[in-house]
Amino acid sequence: MAQFSAHRQEWFGSVTNSNIFEVIMMADKDGNIINAFGLSSNINIAAGLVDGWATIHKFGAVPAMSQNSSGTIWDVNDTLYPWDAFDTPSALTISTTTSNGTLSSLDDGITVHVLGLDENFEEVEDTFTISGNSATGTVVFKRVYRAYIDGTTANQTQIRVSNDTDEILRINIGKSQTLMSIYTVPAGKTGYLLQGVSTCAANADATVDMYVRYFGQDSFRIGHTAEVAGVGGQYSYQFGVPIQIPEKSDLDIRAEVRSNNARVTAAFDIVLVDNEI
């Protein structure tokens, strides 16, 4: 393309050291030039127009934590997420119960989708149809990160998904989807954590920690921490340089609360990039 120097008031027609410069552009998979800066550049990634790039938005809420308790921000109060349940990959089972754990058939016939990773840490999905108060799957999972229901009405029961004897997913009554601030980066991809947010119910406060277990390590360690209070509004942090999270690494957002019946939420956004790029 023709280039013009506003400073020298001449076209860059001759090839000299002062006239040579480099123009770098970013294109989608169809060759269309796209914006490489700012929030608008992420729209093409979310739309699937950039090969090898994808996004995941994870969000969770713990309903009502007890005073001076701690746990993962997911659908079960005062409980750390049972990562050890995945030491042996297995198929899953579902039971539908009342809020106190009594089996119930109110959601007979509904469809439940479970998303996660298989024994090779690759994306898989299983679909369950509740018969009475239970269902059994066929897909083997090494990790799970989301479940949701089909239908025109919300679930009337707690939908509890188990791996052997451990509950690893729960859809609380009326929510139609899990609310869990955990995630595992799939095989063949690297995650780039862009931002995180957290809130507390009014008159509640908590310490919220992002724990990361990097693949190949046995324990989680803190990757970010925040103090969150209901009277202070939401905590929001956008990383100036995204945090790199290697494939097969686990994220677990946890809260330690100081008030009773504290509802705490957390969410984060990750861009996933194929390792071969």
Predicted regions and their residues:
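Short, low-complexity N-terminal tether/leader segments at secretion or assembly junctions of large
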Residues: 1-39
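Beta-strand-centric surfaces of beta-sandwich/beta-rich domains
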Residues: 2-9, 36-142, 151-277
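A surface/extracellular/periplasmic glyco- and lipid-processing/surface-interacting theme
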Residues: 147
